[in-house]
């Protein structure tokens, strides 16, 4: 299993890493939330850019990114515009989505970008290559806030991300039952044991899926999302509680 190192953080070794999402809508809130987040116990800062109101002004977006970089210089920064179709706050064209991610890559301010698998194969491949040429890692993602597909389909999506040279494939699915959570965990384990040559991130959402956010080290998920303040997805738990449980499982 190949690990991914961002700054001094080795993803894919040891206990799952904790990612927190910052979802401020303007520069003033980016600044105040960044200061509040600075004291929290987490590993990776995800900036959910789809919550930022002034998206059309690239300078404003990058000014906000600069604040995050300067406030928490030691934390890996993951730049994420979550599309409306995958649970995000805003809908933008594919062209605008790619341009925004390329601007983030060009800025030199971000360590990783999130790229949605179903953006379009050619655009995804080109953007991965562009990111890698600028030493930016790619978390390739897929989210379904309605259902959990069969294990074979989950594995197929993760393998497709891997074939597109994602540094970290990621999938988040909504369970309709406890057995859906088992499906996600089964797929994670099979992917990790049989196909993955890099870290993967998987989760089953909502209260039903909470176990998947805690048991990554057992089944093969390299990171998990926690909440500093407001959860960015159903089922997230506080970073302090999360770290406690991850440490217990790691040391057992």
From Swiss-Prot:
Known role: Involved in the third step of the chorismate pathway, which leads to the biosynthesis of aromatic amino acids. Catalyzes the cis-dehydration of 3-dehydroquinate (DHQ) and introduces the first double bond of the aromatic ring to yield 3-dehydroshikimate.
Name of the protein in its database record: 3-dehydroquinate dehydratase
Species of the source: Shigella sonnei (strain Ss046)
GO molecular function, one term: 3-dehydroquinate dehydratase activity
Pfam family, one: DHquinase_I
Quaternary structure, from the entry: Homodimer.
NCBIfam families: aroD (TIGR01093)
Gene Ontology BP, a term: aromatic amino acid family biosynthetic process
Enzyme class: lyase
Active site residues per record: 143 (proton donor/acceptor), 170 (schiff-base intermediate with substrate)
Binding site for 3-dehydroquinate: 21, 46-48, 82, 213, 232, 236
Keyword list, A-Z: Amino-acid biosynthesis, Aromatic amino acid biosynthesis, Lyase, Schiff base
